[in-house]
């Protein structure tokens, strides 16, 4: 039974701290932010995670899992390629407020911050981004094979454009505190 309590404690720490890391960034999140938010001591935090890097990784994985789950659910719910691509945009529209309230897109946040300071997180962000792109490319190619999507559409280029539009929309909305830009970008995809 102690194992279950330990796992519950870890889960609670991650769920509490994940939005803080996403909002403030890895570098700017102080141990006092973590202990104040969780009500736990430094020893309790490090007893569960060993170091700040392990906690940050667990929090990043938690934040990204929400978006990955949305992608998987969208792909599973829609048989056609066009519906999959449209469904993913709908997922982002419906969950924009949740993502925004948690500090924005965790992938973009970590990618920007890690580029300058932390190769491990940069590599993790790169892997997730490339996997996301690969999924979109596969959907486009399936659509081309079934005749839904024009064969002259360059799948790699469109996937980059699609991701950049979503991420750029989030960035613009977050920076200007105006979600209208995000919704307009999504609507025009």
Put a short name on every predicted segment.
Residues 58, 72-103, 155-162:
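Hydrophobic alpha-helical connector segments
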Residues 1-24, 28-40, 54:
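Basic, helix-initiating cap at the start of DNA-binding domains
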Residues 52, 63-67, 81, 88, ...:
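Hydrophobic/aromatic residues within well-ordered alpha-helical segments
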Residues 84, 98-120:
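Amphipathic alpha-helical segments used for helix-helix packing
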Residues 88-95, 130-142, 146, 165, ...:
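C-terminal peripheral helix-coil segments that are non-catalytic and often amphipathic
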Residues 38-49:
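Short hydrophobic/aromatic patch on the recognition helix
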Residues 83, 119-145, 157:
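Amphipathic alpha-helical packing segments from all-alpha helical-bundle domains
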Residues 22, 47-50, 58-62:
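Base-recognition residues in the alpha-helical recognition helix of bacterial helix-turn-helix
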